Amino acid sequence: MARSRLLNLEDQFTFYASYHTNKVNVLIHVFCVPTILFTALVLTHAIPGAAESLARFQLPLPLLGEVPVDVTVPLLYAVANAAYFVLLEPVAGLLYAPILLTFGHLSNVLYATHHDEAMKFAGIAFVASWIAQFVGHGKFEGRAPALLDSLLQSLVLAVFFVWLEVLFYLGYRPALFKRLQNRTGVAVAEYRREQAEKKRARGAKAE
């Protein structure tokens, strides 16, 4: 059951989207979540052994020719994420896979060629992006981030779901988008009902 839920796009997206209904908060996440992922990949190189190349191969690319690629822990993490996202939603996952793999490769390149500057700016951008997201939730969404309820959502799936938000905005799979909107609306209404009941219960106890 747990495994099937992990691969159920509608269940996972509905949970995520119910925490992100405010347009300003959504926009903040569209920019900040990929930034957090990329900078985290850069910063991961500081873990002993993470920057070590486990293998190297030449990747032929149009216009760029043969590009040397080092297989490192950050790159493997990007590959694992890409594979998971393809299982969740094949087309959107395949469209996003090149971006994820580029993130992994560029994190290797930046760490190897601009070590001090890369770590400094990655650290600043990482912290600033998290702060921006907490502001988005506190000031605009009015609800604590999903980080407090689901680490999987916050640390793995968020980057794919902001990608889906962009695709839906561009007209991707409108029937799926409508279905997810309806499910999210139900989830948000249920959350607000529960919050109202808790508030009434607290008020009754105070009397």
Model feature map: region roles:
Residues 1-14, 142-207:
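Membrane-proximal soluble regions of multi-pass membrane proteins
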Residues 37-61, 100-112:
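Juxtamembrane "helix exit" motif at the C-terminal ends of alpha-helical transmembrane segments
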Residues 32-40, 77, 96-104, 157-158:
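Core segments of transmembrane alpha-helices
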Residues 93-102, 120, 150:
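Cytoplasmic-side transmembrane-helix entry/capping segments in multi-pass membrane proteins
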Residues 13-43, 81-91:
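Membrane interfacial helix-start motif at the N-side
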Residues 61-75, 119-124:
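Structural signature of hydrophobic alpha-helical transmembrane segments
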